[in-house]
């Protein structure tokens, strides 16, 4: 029974730490994180929803490498980093929250949902990898 339990019930911290390197390798061609946590997208052709999710995911992953970088990202950081107006950013963020790809941790603060990261980074590579490379 313990084998089944370990197979099915995961510790969220262990789950995401185990795959951090793999996920970072998959998104590193598309985004970089500054030492202060700032977001630098390396691809312009990405749609706004994917850009926002990539920024939130990258920030989350960066925190796993360097705890001085916050895992959450604010609405203002998203707007500034991605050059998006507030109404566009909030609309796309709402879609991502409804789709359970990200979660709001408090007003104007968002974080990636660990068990959604693999699906997202695979989608980004499939959708933008060849166009970008």
Residue ranges: model-predicted function:
Residues 1-44:
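Long, low-complexity, charged/polar intrinsically disordered regions in eukaryotic proteins
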Residues 47-51, 73, 88-91:
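Short, well-structured alpha-helical interface segments that form or flank functional binding sites
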Residues 49-71:
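Short helix->loop/beta-hairpin flanking segments within DNA-binding domains
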Residues 72, 108-114:
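Minor-groove-contacting beta-hairpin "wing" of winged helix-turn-helix DNA-binding domains
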Residues 83-98:
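Short amphipathic alpha-helical interaction segments
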Residues 70-80:
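A short alpha-helical element within helix-turn-helix/winged-helix DNA-binding domains
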Residues 117-133:
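Short, amphipathic alpha-helical interaction segments positioned at domain boundaries
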Residues 97-107:
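A short, conserved structural fragment
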